[in-house]
């Protein structure tokens, strides 16, 4: 049964994919406007204001209007309103009709985000209005993984126009919180918020509005004033909004008991997330304002607004009426989410409990607000609502639909003239490439370069943790969603991978279109001066980066790539197919960058059939000096505590640098190319002659069981420590006496530089790129066999291999200069 359900889901997904692909091949309809608000929750917010303005304007009578609704039943009043208007129709979010409208409409209007499948087509104009000036921190200003903001940023980058209610939205929300400065290719409209136009009404309209509120709630309003309670959503689980509803109900009940209901009526406007759950609570009958009606129409007749962290108060500023805040959880909430303004800056008194709020409201009724509050209110109104005059909608229609910009505030995002880099990091798993990426981003001159990194979306804790180590000055983009295109097109793409010949991405018109569309889906209108595949192991991102418009293209070669392609792990050449595909793309890259000069020559020779020899360059990886030294200073017994049990493994007590028992250490993935088997064979020989020795192998990998068995067969199990993966290998290295490397091949093993930084003598086999792996004279290089390793370890025990001083800062200065030269970012770009 489970398999059957899985097959059905896959068939449905495949069918939907084909439908989307079909409609994306059809012409764009310039006379159709497609609207979505709050993911289909209603005909609401800024999109509604624009929709009604276009519908009422005879100049736009030729336009058809399509609204996305999650439920027609929950929006039955508005559906009924337009039931006989042939220009208006409704589609269910996620339906065939939805994706048809999304693919074919010439105009797209949203106040949040379209789904990850969305990619704006040529001929479409996308207006994203967003849904409020934020008090709560947004985007990258919250210390959440990039995946949480990925689709928002992706939508913004697709947009032709973004709407800002005020300059703060431009500078703080768009440019900083969502990092659009330097890369956004569209325009930002700074002409006020369309939805706020509803608040500018005359006395007759106000009376009519009050009557509509009374009729909607089924209450007698009379002369009573309206207190609107409009809290934000503060839950952490969108699947359990009832947790928030219970709290809402209690507060509303307590508030109603505390006020004089002969003079006031309390109206609740719940957040979009919880409304349909709140609507079923009997205790909120006659209080809860319907979700399908415009909030700003309610604000127009509200006498006092009570909120917490909702952006609604920025809208209400335009009325000049009192605002009060109820924030019993402010200490926890401000610490968890973060706020752009402290409570003492808010335009109203702040209550920490409902009884305190009741007293505040009574004071406002009897005495008005204090002079200090009035001053804050006026200041914030000038800062955040100065554009609001009831005409924002008409101005935005002028700009977007008539193409008139003269006399309007239509601006670009900030540009500082820096060279822009887009770097694919790889999968961000804990490995040498990820460490090198982190080190590089810590060394880049952000005064000269605007840096964006992109990586596959992942929720794995170990990957998210590594993403968190990236320098925060680099903009992070997580690739979410999948490619568009028909199944036939994707079949041809996959067949090209099986034949190890990916050149069809540029030689086939259909494949070129597929990849160009994927670039636009991921990056919208963003433009980069340089794109860099820092991983160099995955054909997908290698191909994708080649479709960056007008960019220099570089790809990193972290190893002897031909040898790595033929590396056998558990009887299989796991990298062969992918790397042969990547090799076929080398001719399309401007720079092929190895991580050392000698490795550059190896790759230049071995890859001659795939790439122009003149395009090979080198740039050594950087060392993370501060982290290594800080880690090394941690006592080993502290560094290796098991986070699950809180216990220190018994072997930690055996690691004492300089003791009579000499400790050899190595660190790296337990895989074929590291050849730990050869190291074990050599150590067994040394240990027989010097029983007071031990070997520590730091790392994990597929060969762990085989290596443990080999140590047992060799009779050295008691003298060999397998630590498994360690978050701080440097503390273990610092507690050892000599570092040993036994690899078949390496690119530039950073572990050797780290060994130098912690002051270890080094014995290493003569792998192909060893000449550039460490500074000359800083390691004993031995033959790449058991005998060579035995000779090297014995030489250390005899006092002939010593630690050598290493100037890591000088090394890093040279390495970052090589990076700039390798990507052509400085004069004399050819470095080898």
What is the meaning of each model-derived region?
Residues 372-396, 801-830:
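A charged, aromatic-enriched C-terminal amphipathic alpha-helix characteristic of glycosyltransferases
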Residues 99, 147-162, 518-525, 561, ...:
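Membrane-proximal helix-turn-helix segments that form the acceptor-binding/catalytic region
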Residues 161-185, 564, 587-618, 623-638:
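A short, active-site helix/loop in glycosyltransferases that binds the activated sugar's phosphate group
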Residues 305-306, 322-333, 761-764:
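Short hydrophobic beta-strand element within catalytic cores of glycosyltransferases
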Residues 83-85, 274-291, 473-481, 708-724:
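Nucleotide-activated donor-binding/catalytic signature segment of Leloir-type glycosyltransferases, i.e.
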Residues 45-51, 194-278, 629-660, 671-699:
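Conserved catalytic-core segment of nucleotide-activated headgroup transferases in glycan assembly
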Residues 349-354, 776-787, 794-800:
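Conserved acidic donor-binding segment of nucleotide-sugar-dependent glycosyltransferases
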Residues 725, 744:
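Aromatic "clamp/platform" in nucleotide-sugar-dependent glycosyltransferases that forms part
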């Amino acid at each position: 049964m489970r398999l059957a359900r899985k097959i059905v889901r896959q068939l449905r997904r495949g069918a939907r994919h084909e439908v989307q692909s079909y409609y994306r091949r059809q012409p764009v309809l310039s006379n159709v406007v497609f609207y979505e608000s709050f993911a289909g929750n209603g005909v609401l917010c800024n999109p509604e204001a624009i929709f009604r303005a276009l519908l009422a304007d005879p100049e736009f009578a030729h336009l058809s209007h399509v609204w996305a609704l999650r439920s027609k039943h929950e929006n039955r009043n508005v559906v009924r309103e337009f039931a006989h208007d042939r220009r208006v129709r409704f589609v269910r979010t996620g339906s065939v009709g939805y994706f048809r409208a999304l693919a074919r409409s010439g105009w797209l209007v949203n106040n949040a985000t379209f789904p990850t499948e969305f990619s704006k087509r040529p001929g479409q104009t996308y207006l994203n209005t967003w849904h409020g000036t934020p008090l709560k921190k947004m985007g990258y200003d919250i210390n959440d993984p990039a995946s949480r903001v990925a689709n928002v940023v992706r939508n913004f980058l697709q947009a032709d126009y973004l709407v800002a209610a005020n300059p703060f939205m431009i500078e703080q929300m768009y440019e900083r919180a969502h990092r659009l400065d330097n890369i956004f290719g569209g325009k930002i409209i700074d002409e006020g918020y369309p939805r706020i136009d509803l608040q500018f009404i005359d006395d007759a309209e106000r009376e009519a509005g009050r009557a509509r509120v009374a009729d909607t709630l089924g209450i007698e309003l009379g002369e009573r004033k309206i207190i609107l309670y409009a809290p934000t959503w503060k839950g952490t689980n969108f699947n359990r909004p009832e947790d928030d509803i219970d709290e809402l109900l209690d507060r509303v009940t307590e508030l109603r008991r505390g006020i004089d209901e002969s003079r006031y009526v309390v109206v609740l406007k719940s957040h979009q997330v919880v409304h349909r759950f709140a609507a079923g609570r009997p205790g909120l009958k006659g209080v809860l304002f319907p979700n399908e009606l415009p909030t700003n129409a309610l604000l127009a007749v509200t006498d006092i607004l009570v909120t917490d962290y909702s952006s609604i108060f920025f809208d209400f500023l335009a009325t000049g009426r009192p605002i009060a805040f109820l924030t019993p959880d402010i200490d926890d909430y401000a610490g968890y989410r973060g706020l752009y303004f402290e409570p003492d800056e808010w335009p109203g008194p702040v209550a920490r409990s409902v009884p305190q709020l009741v007293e505040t409201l009574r004071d406002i009724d009897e005495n008005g607000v204090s002079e200090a509050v009035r001053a804050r209110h006026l200041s914030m109104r000038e800062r955040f609502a100065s554009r609001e005059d009831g005409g924002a909608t008409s101005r935005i229609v002028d700009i977007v639909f008539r193409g008139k910009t003269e006399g309007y505030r239509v601006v670009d995002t900030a540009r500082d003239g820096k060279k822009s880099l887009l770097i694919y990091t790889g999968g961000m798993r804990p490995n040498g490439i990820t460490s090198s990426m982190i080190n590089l981003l810590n060394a880049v001159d952000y005064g000269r370069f605007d840096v964006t990194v992109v990586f596959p979306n992942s929720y794995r804790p170990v990957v998210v943790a590594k993403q968190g180590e990236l320098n925060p000055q680099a903009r992070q983009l997580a690739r979410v969603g999948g490619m568009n295109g028909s199944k036939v097109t994707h079949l041809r793409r996959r067949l090209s991978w099986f034949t190890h010949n990916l050149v069809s991405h540029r030689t086939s018109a259909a494949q070129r279109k597929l990849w160009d569309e994927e670039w636009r889906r991921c990056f919208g209108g963003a433009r980069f001066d340089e794109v860099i595949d820092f991983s160099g192991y995955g054909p997908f991102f290698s191909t994708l980066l080649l479709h960056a418009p007008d960019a220099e293209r570089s790809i990193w070669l972290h190893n002897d790539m031909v040898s790595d392609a033929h590396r056998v792990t558990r009887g299989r050449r796991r990298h062969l197919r992918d790397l042969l595909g990547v090799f076929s793309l080398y001719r399309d890259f401007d720079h092929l960058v190895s991580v050392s000069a000698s490795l550059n020559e190896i790759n230049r020779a071995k890859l001659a059939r795939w790439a122009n020899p003149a395009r090979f360059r080198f740039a050594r990886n950087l060392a993370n000096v501060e982290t290594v030294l800080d880690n090394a200073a941690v006592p080993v017994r502290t560094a290796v505590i098991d986070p699950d049990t809180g216990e220190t493994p018994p072997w930690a007590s055996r690691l004492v640098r300089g003791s009579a028992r000499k400790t050899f250490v190595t660190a790296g993935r337990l895989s074929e190319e590291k050849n730990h088997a050869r190291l074990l064979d050599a150590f067994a020989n040394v240990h027989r002659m010097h029983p007071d020795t031990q070997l520590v192998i730091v790392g994990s990998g597929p060969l762990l069981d085989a290596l443990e068995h080999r140590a047992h067969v060799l009779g050295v199990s008691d003298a060999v420590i397998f630590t498994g993966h360690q978050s701080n290998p440097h503390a273990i290295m610092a507690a050892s006496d000599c570092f040993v490397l036994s690899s078949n091949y390496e690119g530039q093993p950073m572990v050797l530089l780290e060994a130098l930084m912690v002051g270890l003598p080094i014995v290493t086999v003569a792998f192909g790129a060893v000449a550039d792996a460490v500074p000359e004279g800083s390691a004993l290089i031995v033959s790449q066999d058991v005998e060579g390793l035995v000779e090297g370890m014995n030489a250390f025990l005899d006092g002939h291999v010593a630690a050598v001083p290493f100037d890591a800062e000088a090394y890093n200065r040279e390495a970052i200069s090589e990076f700039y030269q390798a990507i052509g970012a400085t004069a004399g770009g050819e470095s080898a």
